[in-house]
From Swiss-Prot:
Keywords on record: Ligase, Phosphoprotein, Pyridine nucleotide biosynthesis
InterPro entries given in the database record: N/Namide_PRibTrfase, NAPRTase_N, Nic_PRibTrfase, Nic_PRibTrfase-Fam, Nicotinate_pribotase-like_C
GO molecular function: nicotinate phosphoribosyltransferase activity
Function: Catalyzes the synthesis of beta-nicotinate D-ribonucleotide from nicotinate and 5-phospho-D-ribose 1-phosphate at the expense of ATP.
Lineage: Bacteria, Pseudomonadati, Pseudomonadota, Alphaproteobacteria, Hyphomicrobiales
Pathway recorded for this protein: Cofactor biosynthesis; NAD(+) biosynthesis; nicotinate D-ribonucleotide from nicotinate: step 1/1
Reactions catalysed: nicotinate + 5-phospho-alpha-D-ribose 1-diphosphate + ATP + H2O = nicotinate beta-D-ribonucleotide + ADP + phosphate + diphosphate
Gene giving rise to this polypeptide: pncB
Disulfide bonds: none
GO cellular component: cytosol
Protein's name in the database: Nicotinate phosphoribosyltransferase
C-alpha cells in the first residue's frame, strides 16, 4: 500500500471536498453481518438511530461547521458498492466460511444507498437522526460517527502550519509505536483494530493498522474495518452489537417476550452464522440478568464479549458462570473491547493468561490518541465519547442498560422500567472517557 504523508495531506486544503467516507464498506464488519440478518429476518421493521454525545462539556455544534457536516453526510449518501467490493464480499472467506453473504442479499446490497438524515442544533449540540427501515438506517451508525469525529479533528488542526502538523504526527507515530513495543512482550497475544467509529481520521486509522501489521505480525489478527481489511489483505473481524437485542426488546409485546429478547436474537444469529461467529454480547440489559436467565445452550457458544464492565471483573463473572454450567473456561474465548489502553490490555492479559482464551479489540485508544502530541494543548484533539444508538423500533422506544449506568441510553421512564424488570445487579458506575 502506498504511504501517505498525513501531515501534508491535512495541510493541503486545495480540493473542494476531501471525503471522510470513501466507501460504503468503510464500516465495521459486524454491520454487514447484522445487516444480512435484518434484511432476511426483520425486513419490515422500522428503526431510528440517534447521535449521542456523552461528553456533554464538548459542544459539537460550536466546534464543527454545519455546512461541512451536511456536505460530508450528503457525500456519503452518493456512495454505492463498487464492482471490486462486490466481488470481494462474494468471493472471500470470513471466519473460515465461504459465501457467508447470500447471493440475494448481495444483489440487494449492490443498489444500497444510505437513507436521508435529519440535522438540527440544540444547546450547542447537533441533533442527528436517521428514520426509516431498519435495514437502511442501521448502516448510518459507523459513517455518521466517523464523519463527526474526523470533522472535529480537522477543525482542531485547521490553524496549524505544516511544521506544527509534522511534529504532531511524528509524535503520534512515536507514541503509537511505543505501544506496539509493549505489546510485543505478550506471547500468544491476539489483538485486532476496532477503531473505526471514533478514529482521528481514515488515513490515521490506516497508518495504525499498517503499523500493527508490521510491528506485531501474527498477533495482529485483523481489523473490523471492511475497507481496510480488503485493501490490506487482513481478516475482517466482528460479530454482533447491542442494536439487535435492543430492537427485539422494543418490539416485545409481553414480559415473556421482553425477557427472552436477547436469547431470541442469539437463536436467530445461530441459524444464519453459527461456527466461529458464536460470540455472546451479554450486557445490553445487564450481564447479571443475562446470565441469570440464560438457557443452558448459551454456555455452548464459543465465547463472550464483556463490553461495559471492568475487563477483569467482567471476565471473572463469565468464567464463574461457565464453571457453574459445567464448561471448561480454558476452552472458551473472552473478547475484551471496552475503552482499552495498553495498560488495560497488558493487565487483563496477564490476569487471565492460561485460564481462558483471549482476544482484544482495540478501539479509540488505538486510532485517536493524540494526547500530548501537539506542541501546545489542543482540546479538540482529545477523543470524546460519542455513540449512535437505536432510539425506537416501530415507534416503540429502545433502551440499553449496560453494566455501566453512564452508558445507558433511552427515555428515562423506559430506562427505569427496564431496570425494574431486569434488575440493577452488579452495575458499576464508571466515568466514560471514550
Amino acid at each position: 500500500m502506498a504511504k501517505t504523508d498525513i501531515a501534508r495531506r491535512v495541510y493541503n486544503h486545495a480540493w473542494k471536498l476531501d471525503p471522510i467516507i470513501r466507501s460504503l464498506i468503510d464500516t465495521d464488519f459486524y454491520k454487514l453481518l447484522m445487516l444480512q440478518m435484518i434484511w432476511k429476518l426483520y425486513p419490515d421493521v422500522n428503526a431510528s438511530f440517534t447521535l449521542i454525545n456523552r461528553t456533554k462539556r464538548v459542544h459539537l455544534a460550536e466546534e464543527i461547521d454545519e455546512g461541512d457536516l451536511r456536505e460530508q453526510l450528503d457525500h456519503a449518501r452518493t456512495l454505492r458498492l463498487s464492482k471490486k467490493e462486490m466481488i470481494w464480499l462474494a468471493g472471500n472467506s470470513f471466519y473460515g466460511r465461504a459465501q457467508i453473504f447470500e447471493p440475494e442479499f448481495l444483489a440487494w446490497l449492490s443498489n444500497f444507498q444510505l437513507p436521508e438524515y435529519e440535522l438540527s442544533k440544540k444547546d450547542g449540540q447537533y441533533v442527528l437522526d436517521f428514520h426509516g427501515s431498519w435495514k437502511e438506517t442501521t448502516m448510518w451508525e459507523i459513517p455518521a460517527l466517523a464523519i463527526v469525529n474526523e470533522l472535529r479533528s480537522r477543525s482542531a488542526m485547521k490553524a496549524l502550519g505544516p511544521f506544527t502538523l509534522d511534529v504532531l504526527y511524528a509524535r503520534a507515530k512515536a507514541k503509537m509505536w511505543s505501544k506496539v513495543e509493549r505489546l510485543k512482550e505478550l506471547p500468544g497475544l491476539r489483538i485486532s483494530d476496532f477503531g473505526t467509529r471514533r478514529r482521528h481520521s481514515f488515513l490515521w486509522q490506516r497508518w495504525c493498522v499498517e503499523a500493527l501489521k508490521e510491528g506485531i505480525g501474527p498477533a495482529f489478527t485483523g481489523t473490523s474495518n471492511v475497507l481496510l481489511a480488503m485493501d490490506s489483505d487482513l481478516e475482517a473481524v466482528g460479530t454482533n452489537a447491542h442494536e439487535l437485542p435492543m430492537v427485539a426488546a422494543a418490539l416485545a409485546q409481553t414480559d415473556e417476550q421482553l425477557r427472552n429478547a436477547p436469547y431470541k436474537i442469539l437463536r436467530d444469529w445461530n441459524k444464519l452464522y453459527g461456527g466461529n461467529l458464536l460470540i455472546v454480547l451479554p450486557d445490553a440489559f445487564g450481564t447479571a440478568a443475562f446470565l441469570r436467565d440464560a438457557p443452558e445452550w448459551v454456555a455452548d457458544w464459543t465465547g463472550f464479549r464483556p463490553d461495559s464492565a471492568p475487563p477483569i471483573e467482567g471476565g471473572e463473572k463469565i468464567i464463574d458462570w461457565w464453571k457453574k454450567m459445567g464448561r471448561d473456561p480454558r476452552q472458551k474465548l473472552l473478547i475484551f473491547s471496552d475503552g482499552l489502553d495498553v495498560d488495560a490490555i497488558i493487565d487483563t492479559y496477564r490476569h487471565f493468561e492460561g485460564r481462558v482464551r483471549m482476544s482484544f479489540g482495540w478501539g479509540t485508544n488505538l486510532t485517536n490518541d493524540f494526547a500530548g502530541c501537539a506542541p501546545t494543548e489542543i482540546s479538540g484533539l482529545n477523543p470524546i465519547s460519542i455513540v449512535c444508538k437505536v432510539s425506537d423500533a416501530n415507534g416503540r422506544p429502545a433502551v440499553k442498560l449496560s453494566d455501566n449506568p453512564q452508558k445507558a441510553t433511552g427515555e428515562p421512564a423506559e430506562v427505569e422500567r427496564y431496570l425494574k424488570f431486569f434488575g440493577a445487579e452488579d452495575r458499576v458506575d464508571q466515568t466514560v472517557l471514550v
